[in-house]
Amino acid sequence: KTPWGVGVLGLVPDSAWWGRLLAEPRLKIFAALPCLERWGPQVAFAVAEVEVEPTGGDQTFWVTDSPKAAAAIIEALSADGVAAELVAEAGGLKLFSLLGFYQADDVRLARAPGSLTGVIGAAPTQFDV
């Protein structure tokens, strides 16, 4: 965590490093890599002390400790108008990508399953040129 420092961290099946961002609210995911669809699925995130802003084509990253199955969480979010997709699951935590830009205090997310939850960043959705 140095000024202007950026970390690029991979999504690995046995690590919920992204859950630690709930305890480090100044650190945010601001990019999901690769950014181009033709390069394959997103497998890493860029993290820094930045304020993320909407771009018009965003995905928001949200964490929950809910013991419910991912499908049940997706259904609960969907009932509240939030489109979600499971990104990773490890250490009792689940990481979801939410279609659109959501603020940390969004009431729809406050109603979502889990006692330890939160937005940990946002990034543009994948695109192709």
Regions found by a protein language model. Give the residues of each.
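Domain-level signature for soluble enzymes in the chorismate/prephenate branch of the shikimate pathway
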Residues: 1-129
